[in-house]
Design a protein with these regions (language model features):
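Negatively charged, low-complexity tracts enriched in Asp/Glu with abundant Ser/Thr
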Residues: 1-32, 52-71, 79-80
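Short, conserved beta-strand/beta-arch hydrophobic-aromatic motifs that form part
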Residues: 35-53
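Divalent cation-coordinating acidic motifs and surrounding scaffolds
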Residues: 75
């Protein structure tokens, strides 16, 4: 199971999300306050992730410690 910390965050808050895994890369999609968000992992050797959690209309790439960085962004959201 990939993106375990982010999945646990959603489960603890009882927030619905979709998760799937392909080629050792996890993907999460979810809706929050009417907007659609994604977290998509990149495969080795350039392990990282792409997500729009910082700004819903713009995707950005996260490198080292991507799961921790994305999780910290999610924790700043109100009403989560």
């Amino acid at each position: 199971m990939r993106l375990a910390g982010i999945q646990q965050f959603f489960k603890e808050r009882r927030l619905p999300f979709q998760y799937w895994e392909d080629d050792d890369c996890g993907s999460i999609e979810f809706d929050h306050r009417g907007l659609h968000y994604h977290i998509w992992e990149f495969p080795e050797p350039e392990r990282g992730a792409q997500s729009n959690v910082r700004i819903a209309g713009r995707s950005e790439e996260f490198g080292d410690n991507y799961e921790e960085v994305i999780l910290e962004i999610l924790k700043t959201w109100e009403e989560f």
